[in-house]
């Protein structure tokens, strides 16, 4: 499937001129974070569709680590658009980008309705040859750990691959989705910090090649090929993912759930090395969950 994956079909924008950040954060403690070419000052690359339940908590959680970003949104009818516009008004170094086409996952009538073209449209607002981190609206971030991860890459050829755990809360008890290695998705490959000199997103067509980085979204695959890049694992877990909190997913029943205590017992070797124990504190996770906009879920 060709078209939107090529430069001549992309919408190219002039370099965005942003004001200085109006918010403070960990980036204030290192002058190198003021350099727009530094990995300590990446652009947040965010795409949103109906994530009202977790969105506000997610955006504010990453704010002490990230100074600037673009937030693409489409087909929002749950209040997510209004949250984004208000957030960007309050923090003008984040740019709201309304995608003017419906994204259709099956039997798509044109490339403009393709998920990968929506991704390219949003990404095209970020200047080339600067650092980018993918941020998701159903993740909550430990901002200190997130910012510290920006020190990992030592060259523009390195890509940081982030790990995650998918948390589910049922009846005030925390579970982990049994995916990856007994619930631990180790540098899974759909969240990354990278230098923006790569080719645009493409539709995934599996022909036997090994894909460096891929993203799964329901029944459609898209990839961002990071050629000639060296992939580096994150040093420690810096986020919580709540995949079933989304409005369109909250009716999904996941019967393959691991109680948090079992996860901690199974992965005892990771606690204190790849996962700080406080990241798995049930009280902390429940307090976080209760801050979500659950009434609109």
Regions found by a protein language model. Give the residues of each.
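Active-site-proximal specificity loops/subdomain of glycosyltransferases
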Residues: 17-39, 79-131
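Catalytic-site signature of metal-activated, phosphate-bearing donor transferases
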Residues: 1-32, 109-120, 140-297
């Amino acid at each position: 499937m060709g078209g939107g994956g090529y430069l001549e079909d992309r919408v190219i924008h002039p370099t965005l001129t942003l004001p200085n950040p109006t918010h403070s954060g960990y980036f204030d403690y290192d002058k190198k974070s003021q350099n727009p070419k530094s990995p300590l000052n990446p652009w947040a690359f965010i795409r949103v569709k109906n994530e009202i339940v977790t969105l506000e908590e997610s955006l504010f959680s990453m704010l002490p680590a990230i100074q600037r970003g673009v937030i693409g949104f489409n087909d929002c009818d749950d209040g997510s658009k209004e949250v984004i516009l208000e957030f960007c008004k309050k923090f003008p170094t984040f740019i709201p980008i309304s995608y003017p086409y419906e994204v259709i996952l099956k039997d798509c009538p044109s490339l403009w309705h393709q998920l990968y073209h929506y991704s390219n449209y949003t990404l095209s607002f970020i200047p080339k040859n600067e650092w980018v981190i993918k941020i998701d609206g159903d993740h909550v971030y430990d901002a200190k750990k997130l910012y510290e991860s920006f020190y990992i890459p030592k060259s523009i050829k390195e890509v940081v691959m982030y790990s995650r755990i998918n948390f589910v809360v049922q009846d005030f008890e925390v579970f982990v989705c049994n995916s990856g290695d007994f619930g631990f998705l180790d540098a899974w490959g759909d969240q990354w910090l990278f230098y923006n000199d790569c080719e645009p997103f493409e539709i995934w067509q599996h022909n036997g090649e090994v894909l460096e980085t891929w993203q799964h979204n329901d029944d459609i695959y898209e990839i961002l090929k990071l050629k000639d890049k060296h992939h580096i694992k994150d040093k420690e877990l810096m986020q919580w993912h709540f995949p079933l909190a989304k409005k369109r997913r909250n009716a999904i029943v996941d019967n393959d759930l691991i109680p948090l205590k079992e996860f901690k017992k199974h992965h005892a070797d990771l606690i204190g090395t790849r996962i700080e124990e406080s990241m798995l504190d049930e009280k902390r996770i429940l307090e976080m969950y209760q801050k979500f906009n659950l009434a609109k879920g």
